[in-house]
Amino acid sequence: TINGIPDVYWLINNKSIWIELKSNDVKNCGLSKYQINWHLTHFKNGGQSFILREDLSQRSSKNLQIFVVREPRDLVLKFRDLDLRDAFKKILTQ
């Protein structure tokens, strides 16, 4: 596989979306430098990609967070406290 390529490729309604899946509470969601570079390059070339993380500090069903990677190599929290259905709806409307 290519270093840094996300876990999920989703093609829906003429949209091409990449999603990296994480389940941790570490800084930077535990993304490697290769993953960060992949997301930045993809974004700079007009692509859409997201990091979908399970917030392990939450015990509810609404424990998902959505992040994006932006310059200068920053991880930006876009949405929080989502269940899986709402997370996919948010990703589709971006």
State where each predicted segment sits.
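Active-site-adjacent loop/helix micro-motif of nuclease/hydrolase catalytic cores
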Residues: 25-36
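Helix N-cap and loop-to-helix transition residues
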Residues: 32, 68-71, 83
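A short acidic/basic microdomain associated with nuclease active sites
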Residues: 1
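Conserved catalytic cores of phosphodiester-cleaving nucleases, focusing on short active-site segments
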Residues: 8-10, 15-25
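Beta-rich catalytic cores
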Residues: 4
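Nucleic-acid nuclease catalytic cores
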Residues: 43-74
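Charged phosphate-binding loop/patch that engages nucleotide di/tri-phosphates or the phosphate backbone
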Residues: 78-94
